[in-house]
Amino acid sequence: SIDDNDFWECYESRKVVLQQMGNPSSELTSYCKVVFSKGVNTICYLTDNTQKEQETIFAFLDKYGLKLARNKLMDILSKVYPALYQYLLPYRFGNALLDQYFQDYKYQKVINKILPEFVSQVEDQAEKREYNYILAPRTSVIESLNRKDAQLYFMDAMGVEYLGYILSVCRDLNLIASIKVCVSELPSITSRNKEFLELFADARY
């Protein structure tokens, strides 16, 4: 039972055994159907070992996500689906509006819901566009970088929502990461908006 003191210890042992057995697919489909009988506790009986279970976790979040407090959901995901937990970790922009916006955005994306208060915030920002003066322009940020012996890796269409995940993975790998978030000119498509490449003319990329 989820209320047993040794539940998570048994959970980890079972997860290891399943990995050693090769996560038998013959039983996985029926298990994922039956486990939904656990209701709001379903997620505690799933692992991230296989794509099927990961998809079942998202099906659970769609159905029961709003029934769990965010901090409780985060605690469970840290054990059940660490990568998803890392995705939901906050990235601190140093601005309350951006911090809250992206945390709410990621949470709603994961539970597959759009909450009314978030819609109101989006509509409000569509008019105010406060992010335009909260964040520095990309050109000025890049010009301030030390580009000597730099290597440039360009990742197109990677959302800022992944910064919390990236920093968490860097910590796991004992890597040092320094991130500067900026705003680009519209349209942001690469073919029309890549003036920054000129600043890295001598860099490797």
Per-segment meaning from a language model:
Residues 1-150, 157-205:
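…; additionally, a secondary subgroup of soluble metalloenzymes is captured
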